[in-house]
From Swiss-Prot:
Keywords: Disulfide bond, Glycoprotein, Immunity, Membrane, Receptor, Repeat, Signal, Sushi, Transmembrane, Transmembrane helix. SUPFAM superfamilies: Complement control module/SCR domain. It is a single-pass type I membrane protein. One of its GO terms (biological process) is inflammatory response. It comes from Felis catus. Non-covalent dimer of an alpha and a beta subunit. IL2R exists in 3 different forms: a high affinity dimer, an intermediate affinity monomer (beta subunit), and a low affinity monomer (alpha subunit). The high and intermediate affinity forms also associate with a gamma subunit. Glycans are attached at N60, N70. InterPro entries: IL-2_rcpt_alpha, Sushi/SCR/CCP_sf, Sushi_SCR_CCP_dom. PROSITE patterns: SUSHI. Residues 1-21 form the signal peptide. This is Interleukin-2 receptor subunit alpha. Residues 263-275 are cytoplasmic.
Length: 275
């Protein structure tokens, strides 16, 4: 991985025209036999400039495209450019092969078709335009507030138990995705796949935990445990110091008594000799 991409990947916030936008920590959840797509992209969303095998980004080219703008107009900044890795190719020479792009969708899991009621949503960008020699799969980095929609793969039909979408939200101080309520059945079978009931249980569990903050509870419990351990240690130290102090006082008292006894004995002997 290139240093610029590594540094950029470590960041969890991105600045877009004076506004700080929080990136989602993870990718949208995977649903068995289903794919997801974003109809539009919130400002702050980033798309990696990936090239297909045999090509690479130009040395002075951008590592990603950025959806930037305001509530009235948003668009994709930067341009992705790929060149051949052949020794005869240079950074200033782009080798166009438009015939390779025909009939091929560069979206991977996402579709480029946009509904008419979503393309001009304020504060959002349309699907980024394709570039020459683009990789077959696009890698997005979404921001809080982004919504992705799910649909079953070809050969499967949807059994909706709720909204077939996922939204990136901030929960318990962490940007996470909500769990979509969607399950996909095979069109050639009236029954479930053997492994389809487990995802359903996990879906219900995930939905029930959206409003809870187990991490905070765990942190509080750990803090209480550390506090109790600290108090116990302090009590032990205090008890030990107290015992040492008492023993020292007893030794000092015994020493004083012995010295007093010796002094009195010497004086008594002197007075007896005088008599």
């Amino acid at each position: 991985m290139e240093p610029s991409l590594l540094l950029w990947g470590i960041l969890t916030f991105v600045v877009v025209h004076g506004h700080v936008t929080e990136l989602c920590d993870e990718n949208p959840p995977d649903i068995q036999h289903a794919t997801f797509k974003a109809l539009t992209y919130k400002t702050g969303t980033m798309l990696n400039c990936e090239c297909k095998k045999g090509f690479r980004r130009i040395s002075n080219g951008s590592a990603f495209m950025l959806c930037a703008g305001n509530s009235s107009h948003s668009s994709w900044e930067n341009q992705c450019r790929c060149i051949s890795t052949s020794p005869r190719a240079t950074d200033g020479q782009i080798i166009p092969k438009p015939e390779e792009q025909k009939g091929k969708s560069p979206m991977g899991m996402q579709s480029q078709m946009q509904p008419t009621d979503q393309v001009n949503l304020p504060g959002h960008c349309r699907e980024p335009p394709p570039w020459e020699h683009e990789d077959s799969r696009r890698i997005y980095h979404f921001v809080v507030g982004q919504t992705v929609h799910y649909q079953c793969m070809q050969g499967f039909r949807a059994l909706k138990r709720g909204p077939a979408k996922s939204v990136c939200k901030t929960t318990c101080g962490k940007a996470t995705w909500t769990q979509p309520r969607l399950q996909c059945l095979s069109e050639r079978s009236d029954g479930w796949f053997p492994d389809d009931e487990e995802p359903q249980a996990s879906t219900d569990a995930a939905l029930g935990s959206d409003t809870s903050c187990p991490s905070i509870t765990a942190s509080t419990t750990d803090f209480q445990r550390h506090t109790e351990v600290a108090m116990t240690t302090e009590s032990f130290v205090f008890t030990t110091e107290y015992q040492i102090a008492v023993a020292g006082c007893v030794l000092l008292l015994i020493s004083i008594v012995l010295l007093s006894g010796l002094t009195w004995q010497r004086r008594w002997r002197k007075s007896r000799r005088t008599i």
